[in-house]
Amino acid sequence: MKCVEVYKKLYHQEPFDVAFCPYRISPLGAHIDHQYGKINGLAINKGIHMAYHLKQNGVVELPSLNFPKRAQFFVSAVPEEKQGDWADHLRGTAKMLGEKYRLKVGLSGIIEGSLPIGGLSSSASVIICFLSALCKVNGIHLEPMEMILTAKAAENQYVGVSCGKFDQSCEVLSKKDHLLYLDTKDDSYELIPTSEDMKPYKVASFFSGLERSLKNSKYNLRQDECKAAAYALMG
C-alpha cells in the first residue's frame, strides 16, 4: 500500500492503524436501490486505504494520493456548506456522525484509492473508510445498519447526491465468496455462498478511460426520472 509508505516518510513512524473499505460491483440493480427495489452485488479486493494516527486536538488533516488539496477541518466544527472538493465526503461524514455522537478526537494521515475514480462506488468507499477510522479514534461502535445509514446521509444531506443505500450496504455487509441479495425497502438481506457445483470464475472490471463524479453528473436527474416513470406506470 503506497499510503503506508508515504505515511512513514512523512511522519517517521508506523501508523496507528490502516483503515480499508472495498469497492463494489453490481451485477443487477443499478438505479433500483433508490426506488426501494431488490438488488445484488459483491465487494472486490480493491478499495480505499487510509493510514492514520490520532489528533487529540480534534483536527482532521488528510491529503489524498489521488486528488489535489488537503482535507483540513475540526471534527466539532464542520462547515455548514460544502466546499466543492473531494473532502466534502469527509466533512459530511464528520457532520452526520457528530449529530449523534460527541466527537473530540481527529486524525491525520494519508488516504489512497487503488483504482480510477468512478463506477465502483468510490465515494461511498471513501466515506466508510473515513467513518470507520473516525469511530475508532473516538471510541464509537456503530452497528452495520447505522454505519450504512450514516454514510448514506453524508452523501444525501451534505455532498448532495441522492443515492440509495446499495453501495454502502454492499461495502459493509459483503463477505468473501458470497453474493449480497438486498431488499432496500425493508433492509433485509441474504449472503448467498458460491455453490460447490459452480465452476471457478473471476470477475473482470474494465476502465473506460473516463473518470466521473456523481455530484457533477445527472445522477439526481436519473432518480427523478425513475420516480416519474413509476408514477406513470401506476396511472
Predicted features along the sequence, with ranges:
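Anion-binding (especially nucleotide phosphate/pyrophosphate-binding) glycine-rich loop
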Residues: 1-18, 46-148
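FAD-binding core of FAD-dependent oxidoreductases
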Residues: 26, 33-36, 43-44, 86, ...
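Glycine-rich, charge-dense phosphate/pyrophosphate-binding loop(s)
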Residues: 18-24, 28-30, 176, 184-187
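Beta-strand residues in well-ordered beta-sheet regions across diverse protein folds
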Residues: 28, 51, 61-63, 182, ...
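Short secondary-structure capping/turn segments at boundaries of alpha-helices and beta-strands
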Residues: 14-15, 28, 36-39, 49
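Short beta-strand scaffold segments in enzyme catalytic cores
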Residues: 26-29, 48-52, 169-172, 179-180
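ATP-dependent small-molecule kinase catalytic core of the GHMP/sugar-kinase superfamily
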Residues: 35, 140-235
